[in-house]
From Swiss-Prot:
Gene name of this polypeptide: tmcA
E.C. designation(s): 2.3.1.193
Record family assignment: Belongs to the RNA cytidine acetyltransferase family. TmcA subfamily.
InterPro entries, A to Z: Acyl_CoA_acyltransferase, GNAT_dom, NAT10/TcmA_helicase, P-loop_NTPase, TmcA/NAT10/Kre33, TmcA_N, tRNA_acetyltr_TmcA
Reactions catalysed according to its record: cytidine(34) in elongator tRNA(Met) + acetyl-CoA + ATP + H2O = N(4)-acetylcytidine(34) in elongator tRNA(Met) + ADP + phosphate + CoA + H(+)
Name this protein carries in UniProt: tRNA(Met) cytidine acetyltransferase TmcA
GO BP term (any one): rRNA acetylation involved in maturation of SSU-rRNA
Gene3D superfamilies the UniProt entry points to: 3.40.50.11040, 3.40.630.30, P-loop containing nucleotide triphosphate hydrolases
Naturally occurring in which organism (per UniProt): Idiomarina loihiensis (strain ATCC BAA-735 / DSM 15497 / L2-TR)
Residues that span the membrane, as ranges: none
Pfam families referenced in this protein's UniProt entry, alphabetically: GNAT_acetyltr_2, NAT10_TcmA_helicase, TmcA_N
Coarse class of the protein's main subcellular location: cytoplasm
Task performed by this protein: Catalyzes the formation of N(4)-acetylcytidine (ac(4)C) at the wobble position of tRNA(Met), by using acetyl-CoA as an acetyl donor and ATP (or GTP).
Residues that hold acetyl-CoA according to the record: I424, A425, V426
Amino acid sequence: MAERSGYRQLQLLQDASLWREYCEARSESSIYLSNLQTHADAVLSRYRDYLGHEFEQVWIDCHDGLHADAIAALCGTVTAGGLLSILLPAESNAMSHRMERFAAKHFAESNIKPYSSVNKTETRSANETLQLTNEQNSIFNALTQSTAKPYETHIITAERGRGKSTLLGQALAQAKEHRSIIVTAPRKANAKVLLQQAPEAHFVAWDKLLEQPGNSEVTLIIDEAAGLPLWATEQLCQKFNPWLLATTVAGYEGCGRGFAVHFTDWARKTLPQVSVHQLTQPLRWPANDPLEQWLTETFLLNEQPVTQFGNRESGTFIKHASELEEALLQQCFQLLLSAHYQSSPNDLNLLLTEPGHKLAYQSTNGEVTAVAWLMSEGPILSPLKEEVRQGQRRPKGNLLPQAIGYFLQQDWAMDLHWLRVARIAVPAAKRRRKAASELLAEIYRWALDNNYQMLGTSFAWSPGLDNFWKKNGYALWRLSSRIDSVSARPAAIYALPLTNEFTELYRVCQLLGQWGQNQLQWLSGGKETLQLTEERNKIRTSLIQAYRSKTIPFDAAHFALAQWFYWQHSNHPLTELLCNSSTTLKHLGEYWGGVSQRQANENLCKEVCLLH
């Protein structure tokens, strides 16, 4: 493929009127995204709609707040010689300073001067057959030769602009005569380039594909696989014959790097034969493109490990991310990225700009051996507190007190100062050495010293994580009966009071811990476990009252209703159905003669009111 000429340029401005003046004179081949301006092409939250497109200029209005995910994603749509122009927030912060600092490093001219022209770039028809580079051709040969190996799976990772989709399209065009092939992606637009190379390809939306019966004779291609929930990708690979899975690894739609680690491990354990390939040579712009270098350094998208930082001091430290030297920040953030599938550049923005967020890390001779992302939450003050309990408000940055105040109807939880362990990560080579537990012990001491009243965490539940947190003193308080669409697991809340065992707070926390444990037993063991619960319980009473008043949904009240009917109304016709943890409103609708789920909920509310 002929390399396009011309380095791409960056423009960062803080003067809104000046930026919009430049924006009005933008190229016809451009896109303008803004949450504030009605004449923009789209709001920032719709940035994913433009992945797979190419523009001479991309204009992003971040005046009301930086959107790092949009910047990272749309940077890859700027063609060679083109321009990325960003209106920075009105008030400078650590992230905007970081953007300007690395702009000064990678662009020789001042990045606050007007951008006057766009270098002309080589254009081509979207349907033109492109000559593959040596790197692409090597992978292409491996892909096409595998047509003789019907159960070989290829995983291809690349940063943006490496010709990944073009390669897949040409491989698909070559192989379609020999196989029945289906293409899927998070959105059809994500597979635009691939489908242009093989216009006869059959595209099916991934959620529709999951509903179809499995067929091992149908070959599957997934483009931008990191944009799908990991469980969905795994199910698709088990239902069909996975041939090609490709994803971008530079941090949008979740973190492609996290996908590459987690999915590749799963694939090698599960699928018959797996080959992993990586594309490194940029094709949409020249090598050493300053805009790509700026993006990589600014948002820490580099995959290369940072082995040591300058300060060789060993120990456990809790600091704001903006206080860390660059190499240390890179180590901490890369560890969080690799350990958590759903990570993104916006995470770095939060760490650098939110004053209540901290990084707790353990280091030995300049190497980070464990890291945790901490968030300060609560208290929630009146009158907002009552609106939260009623489900009318969900104040940003207060996940634990808000969730406990609403889903468990515990008003007092909103009065307290919480420290949430949002994420914790340990390098794979150092796991099972108690580094994470040691870090949690230090976090406990630090929280006590800094006048927090509660520690807590929330995550997608699994038996292993349940065991880990309980070993470290945390108790399960709530397990959602809904399955998360990304993890295919229920969301869980665990908590640990920072008080002695003789206080009223400690006693209430013990009751909530017992409630959560009983709920877990019920979800896994069914009706028989209800005999282990108490005949009368204040938590149950609060939840049933909230359900009667239509404050909380059926899902949040189901366990309380199951207990109540089991103990107080054992002979009621609904008892058997409600004591089954898998019962849904759909089942209740069938019980009432096929009524809608909404009507089934209304009927149940009326029945509870009559019995109460």
